[in-house]
């Protein structure tokens, strides 16, 4: 589904504790309405829903510069219901579509030590560029992830990752 403030807010209000910690450390606050209004303006993205229509995950790409997108993702505890399908959709459709639209580089950040996020980023084709020491609002370390259009062209030739969220 398209990014809509009410759907983003529903995911944000029910997001996993670890995602909430990460958002707070990034200074994005814990105000679901504010986060929803901000991400609804993202140029790229969607809401992933369960079969019953419940919003489960928000994926948003904000264009920071022409060709450079900052990627945000958070989800509810129901993510395992759609994790594999969501990963496949991102790899097969979303990421190649971003490249076709002229995105040269996507970046994302995750709390250092958030092992699930690290595994998932790798399964999507991202690579860890560096550790951002004391980057978080409370001095937490973050990993900066990158994915370039060259990486995407190479990854399309690789077998698909199968890790479910």
Regions found by a protein language model. Give the residues of each.
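Conserved acetyl-CoA-binding loop-helix of GNAT-fold acetyltransferases
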Residues: 82-98, 119, 123
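Conserved beta-strand in the GNAT
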Residues: 53-63, 68-70
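Conserved beta-strand-loop-alpha-helix junction that forms the acyl-donor binding cleft
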Residues: 97, 103-122, 135-136
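Conserved acetyl-CoA binding element of GNAT-fold acetyltransferases
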Residues: 67-87
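A short helix-loop-beta-strand connector motif used in the catalytic cores of GNAT acetyltransferases and
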Residues: 36-47, 57, 102
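Conserved catalytic-core motifs of GNAT/GCN5-like acyltransferases
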Residues: 109, 127-142
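Conserved GNAT-fold acetyl-CoA-binding loop/helix
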Residues: 17-35
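A short beta-loop-alpha structural element at the N-terminal edge
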Residues: 1-15, 21-22
């Amino acid at each position: 589904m398209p990014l809509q403030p009410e759907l983003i807010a529903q995911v944000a209000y029910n997001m996993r504790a670890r995602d909430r910690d990460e958002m707070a450390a990034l200074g994005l606050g814990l105000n679901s309405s504010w986060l929803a209004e901000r991400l609804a303006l993202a140029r790229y993205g969607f809401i992933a829903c369960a079969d019953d229509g419940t919003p489960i995950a928000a994926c948003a790409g904000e264009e920071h510069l022409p060709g450079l997108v900052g990627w945000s993702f958070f989800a509810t505890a129901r993510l395992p219901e759609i994790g594999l399908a969501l990963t496949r959709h991102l790899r097969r459709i979303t990421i190649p579509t971003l490249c076709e639209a002229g995105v040269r580089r996507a970046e994302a950040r995750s709390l250092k030590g958030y092992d699930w996020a690290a595994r998932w980023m790798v399964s999507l084709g991202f690579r860890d560029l560096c550790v951002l020491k004391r980057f978080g609002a409370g001095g937490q370390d973050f990993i900066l992830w990158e994915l370039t259009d060259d990486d995407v062209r190479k990854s399309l030739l690789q077998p698909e990752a199968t890790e479910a969220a």
